[in-house]
Amino acid sequence: MKTCLIVDDSRVIRKVSRRILEDLGFEVAEACDGVEAMAWCRAMMPDAILLDWLMPVMDGLEFVRQLRGETGGDAPKVIFCSSETAIERIREALDAGADEYIMKPFDGAIVAGKLGALGLLQERSA
């Protein structure tokens, strides 16, 4: 089973994201900021990371930059999930090492589309 780490300071966003990802067949872990997420990644690198931009302690941009410098940190597919809509900000996230970008609010179809495009969705039998 593929793993996804949800990194967001909003408990509500983490809960909604968890439901979507579990429905897609992922094992899910949660972190409320970049520091907690980095500790989790150092212990067990996930297959995917759903990452908020604006968080206390360490924001998403700093997290992805640090992640990509870690041993094995190039492996996870990082999807930024943010209310930042300016093209310059999206480009900044992708240049920092993110693989995809989703604008909030999002739904299951949007998340599934991005994960599928990144090759992370497994065929599931009914």
Language-model features, listed with the residues they occupy:
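C-terminal output helix
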Residues: 106-115
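Conserved Asp/Asn-Gly motif in the active-site loop of CheY-like receiver
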Residues: 31-35, 90, 108
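Charged docking surfaces used in two-component/phosphorelay signaling
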Residues: 15-23
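Receiver (REC) domain active-site loop signature in two-component systems and cognate sites
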Residues: 55
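Alpha4 helix (beta4-alpha4-beta5 surface) of REC/receiver domains from two-component response regulators
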Residues: 62, 85-100, 113
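Acidic, metal-coordinating helix/loop segments flanking the phosphotransfer/catalytic sites
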Residues: 30-48
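Acidic catalytic/metal-coordinating carboxylates
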Residues: 33-36, 59-65
